[in-house]
Amino acid sequence: MDPESLGVRDSDLVRAGLAIGVAILAIIVLFPGIRYKGGLVNNKKPFELSWTNAKRRFQSGARGLITTAFNQNDGKHKDAFYMVTDNGVEMIIHPKYAHEIRNDERFSISAYNEQSFHGRIPGFEMFKENVVEEQLFINAVRSRLTRSLGKLLGPISEEVTSALRQHWTDNKEWHSISLHSAVLPVIAQQSSRVFLGEELCHNADWMRITVNHTVSFFMAVEALRVWPKILRPLAARFSPMCKNLRAEIEEARRIITPILENRRAQQQAHSKHAASTRPNDLIEWLEETADGRSYDAARAQLKISVAAIHTTSDLLTQTLFNIADKPALIQDLRKEIMSTIGTHGWEKAALYNLKLMDSVLKETQRLKPISIGTMVRVTLDDVTLSDGLRIPKGTKTLVSCHNMWDKGIYDHADQFDGYRFYELRKLPGQENSSQLVSTSPDHFAFGHGLHACPGRFFAAAEVKITLCHILLKYDIRLVGERPNVIEHGVAQYANAWGQIEIKRREEEIAL
């Protein structure tokens, strides 16, 4: 039937179509939760026209929002729910699914990183999906760094001694330090010794870049997130933060390229004896793993710096805040250090036998993981889990860590107990699972499964060696109350402005 026969004109149809289109658009914009099964836990409030305030509430209170949602009595969100995050809408999954999805290839971490960290935009390519440096980095860390740890402990200890003398000083009077600022260069120097060898670990320009690049990177990430995706490549060309990021990468290339070219030339000239003379550092491991493939050495080095230095510094900083007002625990740790290192020296067996220290570090991670949402992924297909939970293709997911402070799992779960995992290791079947580097659905600050942090064994070694030096060489105490943890979305940081007081003491054994 012709519309005109009913007295309906084309202009009326156009106006009606526009009205319907505007209404649909308004519903999508004003009520975004209807696009997600079960709605959004932290949707916009009445009269809020955008998600800006919802994102701000998430940034300042994500831990409480997530925990409350899972604990709701109506059971509506007992398994999973959608939230507006500072990274768009994501599905928050209960930790009971961690073991099931840990090795599921339908959940892609590289796709998540590319989408979340602008991996296709110049300056952010280190997080581009399937970029060659990503696989080289993972393989080099898993196969070479972890395997070489025993030979690296002595050199790491040497760098800790040097860095503490410079940044913590030998002052025997009580004085205040900004703890995070004092820890960061110590971790950066020892890490650079392993990543770049003796040639660059004392290079002031490289040290500046390796410390600053993580901050520059995440500031640039946040700067682009305020733009619609389609405009981000253009915005990145003019953003001062993105320009600074690209400049740091170019400076890193200028520093590392001559070192790499010189090594390649030397190895070609002495190829018959190359295997016995090659340095034992990440530059060399990347070369061996690449096996002739072209890659960006500076980008690979900066990626491991972004992944390792600040997170390791954060763990050590928070650990020192946690124990600074516990002299009895500090004394027990010193006794363990003297007994263990005094007997074994810097060997892997010594680090393994620092069981109380291991417990203190794992307990610190339990109460304050670097992120309260881990195992971040994007689903590559529609997924139905074993109990029927459905996750649509293209969904950004993360697993909540709220069971790490669950009173049903841990006694006095809201309290710091440095001896907790030390005692648990004594129980049958708990010796391995209670170690810092072990992961499980009840403690997965390092992630869990196939993509658990590949550098966690190295990070554990660094923190333990540094803590041995600090506790034997310095007395420490809090300045006032313990500094609050800084929360920003799912991220949790040791307070960068928090201070402690220290003074040099005479160590009982040589380190």
UniProtKB/Swiss-Prot annotation:
Q: What is its EC number?
A: 1.-.-.-
Q: Which PROSITE patterns match?
A: CYTOCHROME_P450
Which cofactor is recorded for it? heme
Name the pathway. Answer: Secondary metabolite biosynthesis; terpenoid biosynthesis
* Transmembrane domains' residue ranges: 14-34
Q: Which family does it belong to?
A: Belongs to the cytochrome P450 family.
This protein is called what? Answer: Cytochrome P450 monooxygenase esdpI
Q: Which organism is it from?
A: Penicillium shearii (Eupenicillium shearii)
